[in-house]
Amino acid sequence: MGICIYYQGVLRDRNRLFDLTMAVRAKCREWGWPHRFVNERIVGTMEILVDHGSGGEDWKWEWETRPVDDRWRGIVVNPPGCETLYLTFGRDGRLIAYKSAPDRQPGHYIANDLLYVKTQFGGPERHIGICTLLRLLEEYGVELEVHDDGRYWETGDREQLAHQMEIINNIIHLLAQEPQRLAALVLGEDAGDFEVLDVEVGKVFREPKPEWRREWGISAEEN
């Protein structure tokens, strides 16, 4: 639950990637946002979500396993309080993120070219900052498609964004503070067996690297 920004796109002129990355780095340094560069050879197999159909009755998404030999470059940003922002590109210029599958052998990846970043617990200013970085990508020739749950990308309305975030925060805190009461409303008599977990609202989870990769460096040059 929470406000997210969804984005996909392609960089037609890949000669502009270096300048684009440096421009994003400059903003991250200005704001104090953690970031790292990526320049990796991705070889093996990947699982990727594929759109089958054109939105009609037979439309569906399916995971497919495919061979992959790609060069993955760009910058990965960690806006405080938000999920990871991948501004990274494959050899064909598409925005894409690769993650090593934690339960598989080396050389198997989860790939995603339909990207999103959750900003609910980062607040309006960091949400706006992420939109600023995406606009920066457009300045360097990235053709973007963006959907913003907070509508800031489309409207530039900070007050509307802050209001939507506040409403969702209130709902989340209600769910966290009165789980037994809510369980009783939903489950009735069965609520007595409802287990309440001790969770930290707003905590950002970082996916651990698989055991075989934890001694690697951040990136590796293409062979």
Q: For each of these PLM feature ranges, what is it?
A:
Residues 1-223:
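Acidic (Asp/Glu-rich) sequence patches and key acidic residues
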